[in-house]
Amino acid sequence: MTSEPQQFASDNYSGICPEAWAAMEEANHGHAPAYGDDLWTARASDAFRTLFETDCEVFFAFNGTAANSLALASLCQSYHSVICSDAAHVETDECGAPEFFSNGSKLLVAPSAGGKLTPEAIRAIATARSDIHFPNPRVVTV
């Protein structure tokens, strides 16, 4: 008998924890308004506000690629760029989604040791050019 090896490349490879499944089962009874105007979304949003101790907006996404891409898109315009390491997840595993959802914001890749950016590497990219034809650095991923 052979068993399938566990995969750790994505949180989409396995089921959810029993506590989350139980909460979803509890929410799956009765009726509630759709599109975020419901008690469940309000409770979850309030939990984030409590956790981060700030009055923040909460946007739910269906997976990590969507979350990463939409977060970067909310920070960048098409003429901006995102500085990341050569091993950054947004560079190696998002298949162009951050650029697509940000209307073309460019990923500017810095060489790194073990995927860690240095202040010098960030500075080198951020100050390389300042002309209109270069995407202005706006975000650094860590």
Locate each region found by the language model.
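Structural motif
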Residues: 6-7, 56-60, 80-82, 106-107, ...
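PLP-dependent aminotransferase-class I/II
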Residues: 102-142
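N-terminal amphipathic/basic leader segments beginning at the initiator methionine
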Residues: 1-23
